A protein has these predicted regions:
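Aromatic (phenylalanine/tyrosine) cluster motif
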Residues: 1, 9, 16-17
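Basic- and aromatic-enriched surface patches that contact anionic nucleotides/nucleic acids
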Residues: 16-54, 58-173
Length: 173
C-alpha cells in the first residue's frame, strides 16, 4: 500500500495521506509546481491527453482563491527500475491545441524514485499551465497549417488580480 498517496489541496497547501497508514505531510502549491518542474512528478502514458479548456482552468483557480476543495490526487511511487521499464510523460507547460496535448516523453535520470500521477493530472496540468505556462487554441475561421502557427493559435496567459475586488463587469478571474 505504500505505492499510493492521496493528496488534498487547500488554498496554499497540499495534504498527503499514505494509504493505509495515516502519514500526513503538508506542502504548498508552489512545492507541487516545483516537483512538476523538476520532473519528480510525471505522467504514465496510460493517462488521457490534456482536455481542459480555459474556462475550466479559470474555475480551478477561482476555487483555490475562494478556498474551496478541489478534490484529491492519487500518486504512484515508482522506483527508477520500474520507471525505466515503462513510458512516462512530463506535464505540459505550454498547451497548444492539436500540436501539444500531451507532455514531452520522460526518460528517468538519477532519482531513486519518481511519483506518477494516477488521478488528478488535469488539475495539476492546469495549475502548471496557469502558474508558468500558456494556452493556445485555434482562432475561428482560420485554416490549420502543417505546423504550429501563433497567428492561428495565439498564446494566452492567466493573470490573477489580487489587488482589487472584481467589479460587476468582471465575470471571470
Amino acid at each position: 500500500y505504500s505505492m499510493h498517496v492521496v493528496i488534498s489541496f487547500t488554498l496554499v497547501s497540499v495534504t498527503f495521506f499514505m494509504v493505509p497508514r495515516a502519514l500526513v505531510s503538508v506542502r504548498r502549491i508552489k512545492e507541487v509546481i516545483e516537483l512538476v518542474e523538476s520532473s519528480e512528478w510525471i505522467l504514465p502514458t496510460f493517462q488521457r491527453k490534456y482536455v481542459w479548456d480555459q474556462e475550466q482552468i479559470c474555475d480551478l483557480f477561482d476555487s483555490i482563491m475562494r478556498s474551496y476543495p478541489i478534490s484529491t490526487f492519487m500518486i504512484w511511487k515508482v522506483s527508477k527500475a520500474t520507471a525505466g521499464k515503462n513510458k512516462f510523460y512530463k506535464f505540459i507547460q505550454d498547451y497548444q491545441e492539436w500540436w501539444r496535448e500531451i507532455g514531452e516523453s520522460f526518460t528517468p535520470k538519477m532519482n531513486d524514485y519518481y511519483y506518477a500521477v494516477i488521478d488528478g493530472q488535469q488539475r495539476i496540468n492546469s495549475l502548471y499551465i496557469g502558474y508558468h505556462g500558456s494556452y493556445a487554441v485555434k482562432l475561428p475561421r482560420l485554416h490549420w497549417k502543417k505546423a504550429y502557427d501563433e497567428s492561428i493559435q495565439p498564446k494566452t496567459y492567466l493573470y490573477l488580480n489580487l489587488l482589487e475586488d472584481a467589479d460587476e463587469n468582471t465575470s471571470r478571474l
